[in-house]
């Protein structure tokens, strides 16, 4: 086997057949050639071989050769072919064991007077030692022989890849020849192509280093011919600069990556300005061929016991154009992508990274790992830098740096540990917090290998996370998902695919962003040259962007966070697991910390991502604080029908929530669990009354026997309640005005009296009886007034107190009590609205008056363009738009509620003009159109008028103003007919003017606008 494995060249065979011969005549090694001069016979001397050195003494062989060259006689060495065009080495792999010279290939006879050929042969000697070292390295270890069998299949694929690269380069040259012939019919050019011989399959069993050394000449030939072809045709078709692959380098190291096929691109400035696409396509094809070679060779050199790539025999570097490059250095155009692997201590993150990098980290990982590996994908070659912090999960300052700098994340967990799986949301929240965005690219990897108990050493194969649950979690957060049996070398290909897929998602996002930016820049450039056409394109692009964003918003689900509250042992976790589709677990496992679970649900054609927070029942009241509940939108109270203590704890939890949450109405449901229990301590009626007291819906289920529909019904009802509370966008007319009976606390403590209250028009009035309003007391509501719910008062049955704080400094307040919680919420909502009603009305009036002035200004422009036309019409679209935009002040009340729609307002009015020059009735909403147009035309034509005269050109009818104010409050007039009575005009005075009756309104109007008496005439 040793002889069969090392039959690379004849010199090696003779060396093995005669190991004890001290002298050897090398005349038989001279090739048979036909020359004019007779060949000179010479001896190269002795070949020394010691036990400590199994390689041929190349230095001694080289010295013999140099001595003969000085004498004028040169002999070629068997197994080495040198040509003038390509001085690379071709190792003859087809040598037989026979000593006959006819079995050897013929070599070129080099003249003794050729110094250039001598330099070529001398340069070839520098590579003989490396080539022989790889060919005759002894493999005495049986394990290495077994590994050689496994490498046969990989070496065959590498041989085919190298052949394909040569064929691709030759095809690219032929394509260029065809293009040149089509463009230059009169010029028949001879395009040099490389006839790359096929690689001998007898190299099977050798490492990739020997394959590259044996076939490097073919690749160099192809690349040099391609370079020469580009230079010859630079003046015809190849106009742009050609990225020639003139320095292709092959280097092997035993450290990080196994084999890096690095090449540097040189820009050759070529003339011409015709067709440059051919040059670019040829260069890209050559680059892609080299990238495919790098990806095919990478990782197939060999590996030691730890999985790291090693060399057999030494390093190889091709000497073409004095090539040498550091394998750790990459091209300047290669981009680095940061990827971080996250997970808890049970996920075996270090082994995952070790299998991907194949660098021998193994079972002894460092505390901080930062390793790069080059990956070639369709979009190009990238340096993937994988980071993780094994053992530093508690040091958030270190992890934050990795979170912010990483572009993609890989979450690994163990399927036999639910705690390991639930840490996904914890890590994702931290990443979102650090990066400031929810647009995160992640991959989820599940490890199915058994857990090993560190104390007992026993393996645990009890699966706690189903594949369906993990797949659902991955789909909700747009993560790729895969499960692996192990993170060893047997799954290296799958791990490589996971990282490659994530890299493709990252680079596609970056390329789409760059394409959008370049597209916008190109549209702008085209706009400068093409004019209107570019504007149309930009409008179309903006329309498409709006449509895409609308589709994206529709596809994005709303996120709702729900909190499960209840005593210990009531079954909160089992209800969540049944909702997620997992079976009931008989074994009890206490929940020691708050865990998040995500469930997707569609209610009323709206898709929700329900984030269900499972709380620990032990000391739940102490763990509830404002920071934990700030993002919670709904609550689920759970108690056990077999435990009255858990039932009584619901009231304590409700009071705790009421003291923390500022909302008066908190969406919640009440679930009575363990309905299958024979020991019942809480009846169904008691649970129903508790739910009525909470203002919630009541459900009684069994986490063991209830079906999936019964388990999911409480969550669906909670989402409906959240929808209702969220859809209360803006105050309805029935909520603005509120009247009814409330109990008011008297001067004496605990002295409650029943009064009739009415909240409307920014006032809160109350009296003893609704029919007798002789003694009515009123409170002016303003934004300084606050409302609060006293939580320190012991609430009795049908008692729902709340306080109106009139003076926060002196703490003067009025304590009121409603009969039901819904009644109390309605009163609080109505009082809040009326507290801000004064600001609302002033802002409405401000916007209405500004809109009227803008309409007058538009009428000025219209009358000026009509040259005195008396039939000018005023635009109302601007008024409607501004009124729709007005009311943003309501956001101060509730930022989540949209403003009322005033699009149905109609500002109109009538009146007569007292001008003696024109007694025609007014057809314009703001006065006589004839007189109005004439004054406006004069104001636009005469620019020498004083500012006072220019202001007097605006004739604002107070009667029309009052009527427009009445119409602007049509939204409020639907509440009560008396609401707009105060806004109606008083009887006209001697001048026929009508002013609003409200002093505050009149003051606001005259502060913000300038109105003058009608009939004034410009001089």
Swiss-Prot record:
Its localization reads: Cell membrane
Q: What GO molecular function annotation could you give as one example from this UniProt entry?
A: GTP binding
Where in the sequence is the signal peptide annotated? none
Q: Which domain of life is it from?
A: Eukaryota
- GO BP field: chemotaxis to cAMP; signal transduction
Q: Where is the composition biased (Basic and acidic residues)?
A: 141-155
On whether Oxidoreductase is a keyword of this UniProt record, the answer is: no
This protein is called: Sca1 complex protein phr
UniProt source species: Dictyostelium discoideum
């Amino acid at each position: 086997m040793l002889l069969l494995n090392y039959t690379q060249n004849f010199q090696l065979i003779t060396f093995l057949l005669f190991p004890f011969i001290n002298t050897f005549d090398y005349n038989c090694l001279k090739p048979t050639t036909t020359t004019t001069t007779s060949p000179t016979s010479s001896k190269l001397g002795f070949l020394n071989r010691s036990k400590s050195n199994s390689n041929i003494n190349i230095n001694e062989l080289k010295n013999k050769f140099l001595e003969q060259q000085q004498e004028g006689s040169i002999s070629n060495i068997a197994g080495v072919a040198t040509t003038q065009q390509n001085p690379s080495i071709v190792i003859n792999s087809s040598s037989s064991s026979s000593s006959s010279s006819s079995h050897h290939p013929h070599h070129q006879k080099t003249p003794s007077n050729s110094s250039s050929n001598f330099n070529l042969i001398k340069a070839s000697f520098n590579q003989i030692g490396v080539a022989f070292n790889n060919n005759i390295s002894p493999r005495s270890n049986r394990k290495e022989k077994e590994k050689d069998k496994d490498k046969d299949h990989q070496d065959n694929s590498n041989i085919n890849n190298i052949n394909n690269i040569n064929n691709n380069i030759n095809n690219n040259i032929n394509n260029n020849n065809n293009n040149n012939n089509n463009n230059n019919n009169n010029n028949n050019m001879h395009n040099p192509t490389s006839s790359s011989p096929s690689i001998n399959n007898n190299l099977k069993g050798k490492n990739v280093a020997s394959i590259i050394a044996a076939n490097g000449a073919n690749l160099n030939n192809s690349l040099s011919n391609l370079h020469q072809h580009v230079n010859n045709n630079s003046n015809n078709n190849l106009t742009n600069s050609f990225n020639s692959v003139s320095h292709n380098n092959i280097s092997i190291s035993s450290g990080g990556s196994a084999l890096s096929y690095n090449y540097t691109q040189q820009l050759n400035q070529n003339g011409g300005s015709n067709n440059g696409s051919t040059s670019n396509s040829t260069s890209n094809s050559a680059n892609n061929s080299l990238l495919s070679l790098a990806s095919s060779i990478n990782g197939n050199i060999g590996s030691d016991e730890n999985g790291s790539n090693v060399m057999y025999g030494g390093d190889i570097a091709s000497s073409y154009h004095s090539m040498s490059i550091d394998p750790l250095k990459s091209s300047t155009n290669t981009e680095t992508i940061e990827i971080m692997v996250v997970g808890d201590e049970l996920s075996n993150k270090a082994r995952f990274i070790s299998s991907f990098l194949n660098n021998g980290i193994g079972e002894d990982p460092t505390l901080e790992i930062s390793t790069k590996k080059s990956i070639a994908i369709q979009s190009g070659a990238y340096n993937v830098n994988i980071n993780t912090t094994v053992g530093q999960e508690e040091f958030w300052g270190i992890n934050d740096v990795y979170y912010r700098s990483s572009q993609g994340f890989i979450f690994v967990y163990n399927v036999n540990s639910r705690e390991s799986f639930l840490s996904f949301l914890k890590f994702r929240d931290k990443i979102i917090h650090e990066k400031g965005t929810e647009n995160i690219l992640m991959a989820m990897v599940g490890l199915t290998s058994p857990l090993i108990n560190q104390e007992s050493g026993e393996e645990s194969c009890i699966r706690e996370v189903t594949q369906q649950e993990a797949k659902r979690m991955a789909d909700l957060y747009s993560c790729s998902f895969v499960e692996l049996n192990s993170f060893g070398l047997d799954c290296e290909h799958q791990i490589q695919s996971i990282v490659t897929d994530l890299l493709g998602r990252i680079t596609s996002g970056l390329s789409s962003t760059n394409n959008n930016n370049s597209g916008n820049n190109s549209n702008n450039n085209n706009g400068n040259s093409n004019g209107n056409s570019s504007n149309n394109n930009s409008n179309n692009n903006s329309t498409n962007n709006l449509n895409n964003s609308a589709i994206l918003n529709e596809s994005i689900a709303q996120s709702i966070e729900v909190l499960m509250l209840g005593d210990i042992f009531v079954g909160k976790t089992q209800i969540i697991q049944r909702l997620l589709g997992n079976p009931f677990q008989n074994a009890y496992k206490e929940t020691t910390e708050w865990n998040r679970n995500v469930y997707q649900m569609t209610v009323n054609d709206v898709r929700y991502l329900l984030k269900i927070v499972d709380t620990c029942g032990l000391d739940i009241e102490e763990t509830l604080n404002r920071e934990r509940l700030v993002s919670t939108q709904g609550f689920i109270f759970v108690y056990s029908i077999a435990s009255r203590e858990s039932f009584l704890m619901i009231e304590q939890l409700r009071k705790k929530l009421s003291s923390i949450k500022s909302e008066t109405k908190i969406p919640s449901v009440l679930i009575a669990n363990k309905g299958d229990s024979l020991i019942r301590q809480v009846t169904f009626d008691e649970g129903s009354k508790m739910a009525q007291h909470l203002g919630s819906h009541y459900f009684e289920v069994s986490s063991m026997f209830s079906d999936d529909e019964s388990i999911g019904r409480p969550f669906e009802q909670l989402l409906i309640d959240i929808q209702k509370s969220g859809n209360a966008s803006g105050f309805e007319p029935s909520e603005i005005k509120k009247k009814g009976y409330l109990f008011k606390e008297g001067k004496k403590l605990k002295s409650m009296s029943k009064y009739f209250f009415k909240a409307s028009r920014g006032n809160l009035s109350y009296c003893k009886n609704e029919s007798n309003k002789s003694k009515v007391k009123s409170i002016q509501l303003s934004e300084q007034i606050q409302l609060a719910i006293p939580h320190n008062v012991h609430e009795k049955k049908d008692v729902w107190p709340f306080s109106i704080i009139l003076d926060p400094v002196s703490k003067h307040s009025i304590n009121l009590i409603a009969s039901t919680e819904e009644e109390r919420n309605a009163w609080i909502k109505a009082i809040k609205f009326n507290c801000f009603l004064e600001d609302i009305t002033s802002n409405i009036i401000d916007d209405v008056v500004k809109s009227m002035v803008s309409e007058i200004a538009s009428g000025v422009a219209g009358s000026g363009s009509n040259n005195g036309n008396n039939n000018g019409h005023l635009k109302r679209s601007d008024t409607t738009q501004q009124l729709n935009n007005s009311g943003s002040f309501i956001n101060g009340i509730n930022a989540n509620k949209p403003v009322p729609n005033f699009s149905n307002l109609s500002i109109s009015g009538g009146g007569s003009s007292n001008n003696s020059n024109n007694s025609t009735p007014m057809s314009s909403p703001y006065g006589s159109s004839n007189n109005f147009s004439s004054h406006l035309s004069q104001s636009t034509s005469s620019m020498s008028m004083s500012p006072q005269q220019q202001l007097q050109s605006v004739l604002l009818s107070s009667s029309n103003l009052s009527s427009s104010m009445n119409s602007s409050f049509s939204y409020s007039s639907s509440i009560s007919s008396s609401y707009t009575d105060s806004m109606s005009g008083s009887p006209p005075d001697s001048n026929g003017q009508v002013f609003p009756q409200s002093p505050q309104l009149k003051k606001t109007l005259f502060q913000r606008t300038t109105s003058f008496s009608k009939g004034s005439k410009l001089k």
